[in-house]
Regions:
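C-terminal motif of bacterial Sec signal peptides marking the signal peptidase cleavage site
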Residues: 13-17
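Bacterial signal peptide processing site
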Residues: 18-22
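Beta-sheet-dominated interaction scaffolds and their linkers
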Residues: 28-73, 77, 160-190, 288-297
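Short, solvent-exposed loop/turn segments enriched in Ser/Thr/Gly
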Residues: 65-71, 125-132, 185-192, 256-261
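Short, hydrophobic/aromatic beta-strand segments
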Residues: 79-88, 126-130, 200-211, 251-252, ...
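Intrinsically disordered, low-complexity Pro/Gly/Ser/Thr-rich segments with frequent PxxP/GP/PP motifs
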Residues: 92-124, 215-251
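Terminal connector regions
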Residues: 121-162, 248-284
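Surface-exposed beta-loop interaction hotspot
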Residues: 138-223
Length: 297
């Protein structure tokens, strides 16, 4: 038991120092990350002899969210090391089983995390029932209940399904160029959020607010409130967001996962929701370059 507890504490210390908060979608999901705190407590076995069981827990860090994945952490409370040859997660909210990746040794009375790629198109709608994990090792297959105390799957499915619905009305993206009022330290830039209607009639998208990131914030403070109204068969809308660096310390420039991922609060046909809009690689590069210049780096 001491080895398992030591491993959990080590993971806690490591992840606390290197991950942030976040949320959903392949290549989607900082302060704006839609994922939740990484380390929900895994159900630890009782003290005493090994229970002879495996325990599974879903977790997601901000980096996981940015990479469009979550992780299943498997605690091995048996007397033998376990090396999975196959891990499969099934969930009624996903259209097909999701295979585990980076399969490797899980020592006795320890735990290991295995990535699970989040599906680009989940089963949107009302789908109920628990997720299950099937683990194959040493010639046998066991089915495990899975804890998800932080609702990683529910949060992802809600956000991704909203994103798909918005894409059918007016996809949102940031322009790749960042305009600046002047070069050098103290400058103010302008981000442009573009809503391009699909032409399908009968829908209205309202953009109420856009949250900042650890690196980039509204020039006037707090969140941007563009209050844009986009008709699904109307013209393209370009919402200008004056921006300044939120911080200028070296550490924030190393936290790349959520630096250019913005939480957008909106209403689609009157239904409120929020989703994360990430800048393209070209746009992210331009935004980070602006922040460095404005910070005087």
């Amino acid at each position: 038991m001491s080895r398992l507890l030591g491993a959990v504490l080590a993971a806690l210390l490591c992840c606390t120092s290197c991950t942030g908060t976040s949320g959903p979608g392949p290549g989607r999901a900082g302060s704006p990350e839609p994922s939740v705190p990484t380390l929900s407590p895994i159900r630890l076995p009782p003290k005493g002899p090994p229970t002879g069981r495996l325990y599974a827990d879903l977790r997601q860090s901000s980096r996981d969210a940015a990479l469009g994945r979550m992780e299943v952490w498997i605690a091995n409370d048996t007397r033998r090391d376990v090396t999975p040859t196959r891990i499969t997660y099934t969930d009624p909210r996903f259209r097909r089983p999701v295979p585990g990746e980076r399969l490797r040794l899980d020592p006795s009375r320890s735990e290991r995390g295995y990535p699970l790629a989040l599906p680009a198109v989940p089963a949107c709608g009302k789908h109920r029932g628990p997720g299950r994990m099937r683990v194959t090792y040493a010639g046998r297959t066991v089915t495990l209940p899975v804890t998800d105390d932080n609702d990683v799957v529910a949060r992802y499915v809600a956000s991704r399904c909203l994103e798909l619905a918005v894409d059918r009305v007016a996809p949102l993206r940031f322009a790749d160029r960042v305009r600046v009022d002047r070069p050098g330290e103290g400058s103010t830039g302008t981000l442009v959020l573009v809503a391009r209607p699909t032409g399908v009639p009968g829908h209205v998208l309202r953009i109420d607010a856009v949250g900042g990131t650890p690196l980039l914030g509204a020039a006037a403070g707090a969140a941007w409130r563009p209050r844009g109204r986009v008709r699904s068969d109307g013209p393209v809308q370009r919402l200008e967001l004056p921006v300044r660096p939120a911080r200028c310390d070296d550490h924030v420039f190393m936290e790349s996962a959520g630096a250019t991922a913005f939480l957008v609060s909106l209403r689609l046909d009157g239904r409120p929701g929020s989703l994360v809009v990430r800048m393209s690689p070209a746009g992210a590069s331009a935004a980070i370059a602006f922040a460095r210049d404005s910070c005087g780096h």
